[in-house]
């Protein structure tokens, strides 16, 4: 039986469009990606917004920390211009904006909770409230490099699907994942081998890998049983993997 490996668009179709913007997410939907991976922060006034960094200067014409600004203040900045003049006018999206886009699809949403340099007290509760109220619990994966945040999510609701992100190798990650009830592992793709994927599957744990940007690597990972790859080039991998 052929292995079906899913393609998740990393911050949308981010190789072509400004990352984590609605134009990037719309492109991923139009391409037929199986899912979207994105990053969540909390504003000063408690709004769940989408951007990768804690500080906005890399991807906007503004400066400052997300945590120190209200949503209205963040709306003053342009989040498309850094990529190209033709994307001028893109604003920072909210989680609700993205959920609105995905509502009529069956796409998976992988939400990375940014809880590294900045801690957002209560972000787990706010995320669960939003995802539940919008009816997305069955197709959201919560991931984070802060595994305490994932354990907290599981403590709040065991039905939440969580996935620890990691870059360096973890010894027997399938056992580690079980310590807080993880449903998936999300390692850097060079940190896994076939035996790890096979053991994860035996224990009912999915393996989704980041960030895979060439079709040769994607084909290899498919051959060893990866469940999904997260990519900046969804169009390239969709054509390769599904051909």
Which residues are covered by each model-predicted region?
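Phosphate-group recognition and catalysis centered on beta-loop-alpha active-site segments
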Residues: 1-243
